[in-house]
Amino acid sequence: MKFLLQQIRNMHVKPIKMRWLTGGVNYSYLLSTEDRRNSWLIDPAEPLEVSPKLSAEEKKSIDAIVNTHHHYDHSGGNLALYSILCQENSGHDIKIIGGSKSSPGVTEVPDNLQQYHLGNLRVTCIRTPCHTKDSICYYIKDLETGEQCIFTGDTLFIAGCGRFFEGTGRDMDMALNQIMLRAVGETNWNKVKIYPGHEYTKGNVSFIRAKIYSDIGQNKEFDALEQYCKSNECTTGHFTLRDELGYNPFMRLDDRAVRLAVGDTAGTYPRSVVMQELRKLKNAM
């Protein structure tokens, strides 16, 4: 099985590792236009780890600091990075965009489906409340090439999803399987590369193998993901929404194997209950 991948040519996405030595395995991202003159810095939680990994030219290009949600390991570096960027780029106007004023220094709170333009890049803000009420996924489309990606924070991980800190199973089902998928559109699912907030894939794969697809051959898409993880440390930017629909149990709530894993032998549980029980099962691992 070949995953549905496209190499991003005109837009540039630079993953920046944070908190890998302390177990957080976070990502910040620098999203830049083709000419690299305009950029967004997404979830720069750790200034001492992020700033040294940005060149002087990259710092000059940053128009906005952007948060997927307010948790400190995503927004905690807002003010320090803002200060650093303003000192190094006198007179450059830098916005801080987030889902609520709970993120430090936020100057703009976008509405659901509000759009921004960064050069040829169109950014659609998809509000996906559950992990936090202010969670936003940023869906990017290059209007020149058609290339696409999405920054999902702690809403969607490769082969998993975030905990329901400020929502319910129904909320996460709505966020993942209705709001996000509809906003992107079915014709784009195989084009949209996923950039999550954490590198949790290996743990998610272990959970799925232990609790859902226990046998090789039961889900070939999942088997291929498992093999990829054995030889690759990082999975961010390598998989699409269409890939996730093939193996992510939180996006496969009607799959008999998923329902059996949560005790729904008759296949009668509402989707919200399946989602809630699946999250409990994952939390217990």
Curated annotation (Swiss-Prot):
Q: Which CDD domains match?
A: hydroxyacylglutathione_hydrolase_MBL-fold
**Which Pfam family would be a valid example here?**
Lactamase_B
GO CC, sorted alphabetically, is: mitochondrial matrix; mitochondrion
* Enzyme Commission numbers on file: 3.1.2.6
Instruction: Name the SUPFAM superfamilies on file.
Output: Metallo-hydrolase/oxidoreductase (SSF56281)
Q: GO MF annotations for this entry?
A: hydroxyacylglutathione hydrolase activity; metal ion binding
Reaction(s) catalysed (UniProt annotation): an S-(2-hydroxyacyl)glutathione + H2O = a 2-hydroxy carboxylate + glutathione + H(+); (R)-S-lactoylglutathione + H2O = (R)-lactate + glutathione + H(+)
Q: How does activity depend on pH?
A: Optimum pH is 6.5-9.
Presequence positions on this chain: 1-10
> What is the recorded function of this protein according to its Swiss-Prot or TrEMBL entry?
Thiolesterase that catalyzes the hydrolysis of S-D-lactoylglutathione to form glutathione and D-lactic acid. Involved in the metabolism of methylglyoxal, a toxic compound for yeast proliferation, by converting methylglyoxal to lactate via S-D-lactoylglutathione by sequential enzyme reactions catalyzed by glyoxalase I and glyoxalase II.
- Similarity comment: Belongs to the metallo-beta-lactamase superfamily. Glyoxalase II family.
UniProt name for this protein? Hydroxyacylglutathione hydrolase, mitochondrial
The UniProt gene name for this protein comes to GLO4
